Regions:
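Extended catalytic core of nucleotide-activated donor transferases of GT-like folds
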Residues: 7-9, 15-122, 139-152, 278-295, ...
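Nucleotide-sugar donor-binding catalytic core of glycosyltransferases
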Residues: 2, 9-18, 126-307
């Protein structure tokens, strides 16, 4: 029987790039693929209903997109039609507590870090199927390369960018995640946040959830896993601050030692420091990053606080 898959795109450019790869792979294997534009989901429901007339093999989605769709109030489509929903998380599960608390029974959660799998098993008992799913890569195709040589890859000696870093400074995005710490009455949230951030920066091998739990234990604040999961999700901005600190320091140290670093992404133009060796090139599309990598001698990458996985 011909396999039939449903995909979602139209919300986040980076996820669209990955989704296109999955669609291409499945299509080459002879599968029938329906790609739903999540940006106009109300108009797309007619196409979705028509596709569901025949048996569907699975939904393949990223970061919960399309997971909570309903044709009728209170009836999740994927549970209603008994369709496996493969949900590939690109980020830590604590960023999606509300969505995952309401996950349909048909969801199979795939995490890109082994620690995230254990986190889900502990803090989301409603999720029965979760597995480690290593992050793959996307190969630059000759049709997409600007280089005119026989290979699509530019020889190292001809590459114009010494060091490339493509990624924003998450500390500015983290500002929007900070809750009203003064409203937390059970403990001194300001002091705990200060201690936790210091621990993360001084011990980068530790996970954010481990440090938050450790700080709570140090003040003898005892809570069950349900409340602990809520607290970790509430303080998840610490993760973004720690990531941003090391991301910024990696670029700054290279620049201060005479290395020219070309950076793309939001936030770099807001840094409190400047260096003639940092070239801020603005924001570009995820697809264009592949070609920029092809023009770079070294591509700098910093893990988003993943300890047993890559991103």
């Amino acid at each position: 029987m011909k396999k039939r898959y449903i995909f979602f795109k139209g919300l986040i450019d980076t996820l669209d790039l990955y989704t296109d790869e999955y669609v291409n792979i499945c299509s080459k294997e002879g599968a029938e693929c329906l790609v739903i534009d999540a940006g106009i989901i109300d108009r797309e429901l007619i196409r979705l209903k028509a596709f569901l007339i025949k048996e569907v093999t699975a939904v393949i989605s990223l970061n919960n997109i399309g997971m909570h769709l309903e044709f009728e109030d209170g009836l999740n489509i994927w549970d209603q039609y008994q369709i496996p929903f493969y949900n590939i998380l690109m980020d830590h599960p604590f960023h999606y507590k509300t969505a995952l608390d309401r996950a349909p029974e048909q969801m199979i959660l795939l995490c890109m870090d082994r620690n995230h799998v254990e986190y889900v098993k502990r803090f989301f008992p409603n999720i029965k199927r979760v597995a480690f799913f290593p992050h793959a890569g996307i190969e630059l195709q000759k049709k997409d390369a600007a280089y005119a040589g026989e290979s699509c890859y530019v020889p190292i000696e001809e590459r114009k960018i010494d060091v490339l870093y493509a990624g924003g400074l998450s500390r500015y995005a983290a500002e929007g995640l900070i809750p009203d710490l003064g409203s937390i009455r059970e403990f001194d949230a300001f002091e705990l946040v200060k201690n936790a951030l210091e621990k993360l920066i001084n011990n980068p091998e530790l996970t954010t959830e481990h440090v938050i739990e450790q700080c709570l234990q140090e003040i003898n604040f005892k809570i069950n896993d349900k409340k602990l999961g809520e607290t970790i999700a509430e303080l998840r901005f610490l993760d973004a601050l720690a990531v941003s600190f090391y991301r910024e320091q990696a670029v700054r140290i290279l620049a201060e030692n005479g290395v020219t670093v070309t950076v793309f992404g939001v936030g770099w133009d807001r840094c409190e420091w400047e260096s003639p060796n940092v070239v801020y090139a603005g924001v570009t599309s995820p697809a264009q990053i592949l070609e920029l990598m092809n023009q770079s001698k070294i591509v700098l990458n910093t893990m988003t606080w993943f300890k047993q996985g890559a991103h």
